[in-house]
Amino acid sequence: MAIKDWHEDDRPREKLLKFGAAHLSDAEILAIFLRTGTQSQSAIELARHLIEQFGSLAELLAAPQETVLACHGIGPAKYAQILASLEMGRRYLDSQLKTGQGLGRSQMVKDYISTQLRGEPREVFAVLCLDNALNLINFEILFTGGISSCSVCIKHVLRHALSHAASQLIIAHNHPHTDAKPSTADNLLTYELKKACDLIDLSLIDHVIVGRNETLSYAENSLPPFN
């Protein structure tokens, strides 16, 4: 049965407008962006199949272009719609952080960093430069490593922060193929960078790790040196 023949309260778009986004499944949200299915599948059936194939909506959004385009029912137009939805979310979060509206909420910071780093095939290290009011001045990936490690130069991080006149920093990196649990090397880098920042009156306020399926904040979890 085509979606247009469903009861109004079950159609994704009508359900979204009537009950709100929280009442929609990942497949229903994705179906709204896909708009149409295939000859044998409705948009929701196609969305469910894609999510099952990749394991989650997050995994689908992080997958390489060629992998998604190889899926039955996904052509350049549908893939462009998926990318546009992801970019719209990124830009919304970016605008929130640049006006200081989101940095008082750790979830907003984690969401922003997650959208920036999830999908990177290699480990990368990024820095968010902030002013005294927690407005985002600059976000930049400073270092790119291999599949499971990334070398970081603390002096370069400090020079980068000073060049943007930052008074506060959040650092972030990803674990592209594992969970977000900090490694011993992660903890040591955080401690050394915090100590270096303190020497020049620069506040390191968090270290965020984006894992394969979750995001961890040192500050939110009171991990050293933020305990």
Curated annotation (Swiss-Prot):
CDD domains assigned: MPN_DUF2466 (cd08071)
Motif (JAMM motif): 173-186
Signal peptide residues on this chain, from the entry's feature table: none
SUPFAM superfamilies recorded: JAB1/MPN domain, RuvA domain 2-like
InterPro entries, per database record: MPN, RadC_JAB, RuvA_2-like, UPF0758, UPF0758_N
Pfam annotation, one family: UPF0758_N
GO biological process: proteolysis
Segments forming domain MPN: 102-224
Alphabetical keyword list: Hydrolase, Metal-binding, Metalloprotease, Protease, Zinc
Top-rank lineage group of the source organism: Bacteria
GO molecular function terms attached to this record: metal ion binding; metallopeptidase activity
PROSITE patterns assigned to the protein according to its UniProt record, in alphabetical order: MPN
Entry binding sites for Zn(2+): 173, 175, 186
PANTHER family: DNA REPAIR PROTEIN RADC (PTHR30471), UPF0758 PROTEIN YEES-RELATED (PTHR30471:SF3)
Family listed: Belongs to the UPF0758 family.
Name of the protein in question: UPF0758 protein Pcryo_2119
Organism of provenance: Psychrobacter cryohalolentis (strain ATCC BAA-1226 / DSM 17306 / VKM B-2378 / K5)
Organism ancestry: Bacteria, Pseudomonadati, Pseudomonadota, Gammaproteobacteria, Moraxellales
